């Protein structure tokens, strides 16, 4: 899931794959999820290696596209995980780490986009937030390495610098725009004050 956190491209990349490719985001691609080999083929196209982590997602835990990708990734030394709503599923058996949510029956039988989909999204948010914290992209409860992609985020970053350093708005914003991130602006300012 894309976020506002500016993860350095050499350190943390995320890539989402879906059975049926980009088309499947808007239209059904019949049979795509039943191809047990295609998931791994797509991972290879994205140059997967043993430094990566693959997280398979399927509410049922029985989707061949995901199972095949996890099986082959693990065979090639890639750390694998999965998120499913079906305990002891075939997908969980192929993952190094299985997250098996208990969500109970869906309100509309078979509509896994409801409780299962919501739970999966929450877990992905927790994983990506934890990664950003471990990479030092978060200070306290603030994203200090966010992408300055719009006015709202520039203003948010400016306020963070103002709070942290006690600077006025103009000075804080100039630092932010000069250094490209809240973290870099704060570090540069503190360094300049010490030297």
Q: Which sequence ranges carry the predicted segments?
A:
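Short glycine/serine/threonine-rich phosphate/pyrophosphate-binding segments
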Residues: 50, 60-69, 91
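Ligand-binding beta-strand-loop-alpha-helix segment within the catalytic cores
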Residues: 21-53
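Short alpha-helices
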Residues: 84-141, 151
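Short, amphipathic alpha-helical interaction segments embedded in low-complexity terminal/linker regions
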Residues: 131-195
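Surface-exposed amphipathic alpha-helices with a cationic face
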Residues: 70-75
């Amino acid at each position: 899931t894309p976020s506002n956190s500016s993860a350095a491209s050499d350190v943390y990349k995320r890539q989402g794959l879906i059975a049926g490719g980009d088309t499947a985001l808007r239209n059904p691609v019949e049979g795509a999820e039943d191809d047990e080999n295609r998931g791994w083929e797509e991972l290879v196209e994205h140059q997967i290696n043993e430094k990566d982590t693959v997280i398979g997602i399927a509410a049922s835990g029985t989707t061949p596209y995901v199972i095949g990708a996890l099986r082959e990734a693990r065979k090639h030394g890639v750390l694998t995980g999965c998120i499913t709503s079906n305990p002891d599923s075939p997908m969980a058996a192929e993952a190094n780490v299985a997250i098996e949510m208990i969500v109970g029956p869906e309100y509309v039988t078979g509509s896994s986009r409801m409780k299962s989909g919501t739970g999966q999204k929450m877990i992905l948010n927790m994983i990506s937030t934890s990664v950003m914290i471990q990479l030092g992209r978060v200070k306290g409860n603030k994203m200090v390495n966010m992408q300055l992609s719009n006015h709202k985020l520039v203003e948010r970053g400016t306020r963070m610098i103002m709070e942290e350093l006690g600077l006025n708005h103009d000075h804080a914003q100039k630092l932010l725009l000069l250094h490209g991130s809240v973290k870099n602006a704060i570090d540069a300012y503190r360094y300049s004050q010490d030297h």
